[in-house]
Amino acid sequence: MLAIPAFRRLWLAQLAAQLGEAIALVAMPLLVYDLTGSAELLGAIFVIQLLPRVVLAPIAGMLADRLDRRRILLAADLARAGLVALLPFTGLAWQIALIAMLVALGNAIARPAELAAVPMVVPAGLLVPALSISQVAASVVRIVGPALAAGVIAVTSPGPAFGLQALCFLISAGCIFTLTLPAVSRAPATTTLLLAARREIGDGLRVVRNNPIVRGITAVEMLWQLVTAVLVVTVLLYVAVTLRLRDEAATIFSLLMATFAAGTAIGSLVARRVEERIGRPRLMALGYLAPLMLIPAIVTPPLPVLFACLFVLGFTDAWAVIAMQTYLAEAVPDALRGRVYATWTGAVTLGGAAGFGLIGWLTPRLGPPATLALVGAVVGIGGPIVLWVTGCIAAMRRDAVAGA
């Protein structure tokens, strides 16, 4: 696959940009916490980062269809590089929030154009291998990014990590600059972007409301965003405050995130074999029970236990994600898939924004151990209940019987 020059350049650009984003997942919370020492402000920064994705989810895909995708990617990379290079020089929370929001806008606009460009440079028969290579690379980046950030931060501070992130975006821009995409004939737009977005949102919402599988998966993924929030906000405070490891907090937090990502990557690699043995419903069930691994935090276990819990959480989370994505793809007609994915992404991102806001408020009041345990119990037990209440489990069983 990498022998195809255009795909190789696009793949390298994806790799570099994703590495930059992975570095920021560790560096951003550390920068905010070092500056403010506040869980509420840390949660608020991530709310601000996520809200642009909620607004742009249905529009960004249409921009990728109407505008030159190469120019979108190049502009997004250069803009993000310039913005994150400013972060080490900020001294106020509102400055970080503004830059974080603008970078999030760039991420939201670039992603659909990036996905849409892959089929343009790969023959139809090689699309699955191309996507597989991209997925494996993304899994590796999720491990390397936090580990790299940990190394930089351990030696210096969070600031230089953003310089490294800016370099990643510049490398991505260099790859895109040399990329040539084939010309695409686009039909003239018959409606304004706003009207088209309203129509697509309506179509997507109808499917989410009326299809029990899509409805259930959307609801449980929104609930799962609480886990994402505690991994960023609460785990950092657990290390810095509960374990009283302020001097080593940056390094340990980075390594914990890398451990979770390693679990996700390894879980993805073995998911297919596990599915063949136990079936997809059990694969997804085990994945959605994974947050129960956060409950041991209530007794403040030693660090090795926390590392093990996060590894298992990531390992089984990958099973839930893979099973969920497969069910989602099978439940939605191809003609509606783009609109449903856009609506689903917007809904889950909205859940993420609410989750970060709630966890930022809850963590200093309950304390990190109790917050981790509470979220683990609520999501680990509540996820399967949500799937049952929404009719998702019954619909999956009917489909399994019909397909037998």
In which residue ranges do the predicted regions lie?
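Juxtamembrane intracellular "pre-TM" segments in multi-pass secondary transporters
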Residues: M1-R8, A183-A219, A404
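Substrate-agnostic recognition of the 12-TM MFS/MFS-like secondary transporter fold
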Residues: R9-L25, I48-M62, D68-A81, I99-A154, ...
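A single, central transmembrane helix in multi-pass transporters
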Residues: L15, I23-A27, T156-G163, R206-S268, ...
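Extracellular/periplasmic helix-loop-helix junction of adjacent transmembrane segments
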Residues: I23-L51
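Transmembrane alpha-helix termini and helix-breaking/packing motifs in multi-pass membrane transporters
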Residues: V26-L35, L86-T90, V144-L164, T234-L243, ...
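C-terminal transmembrane bundle of multi-pass solute transporters/carriers
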Residues: V55, I72, A240-A404
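C-terminal ends and interior cores of transmembrane alpha-helices
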Residues: L78-L92, L289-P301
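Helix-loop junctions on the cytosolic side of multi-pass membrane transporters
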Residues: A116, M120-V121, F162, A166-L193, ...
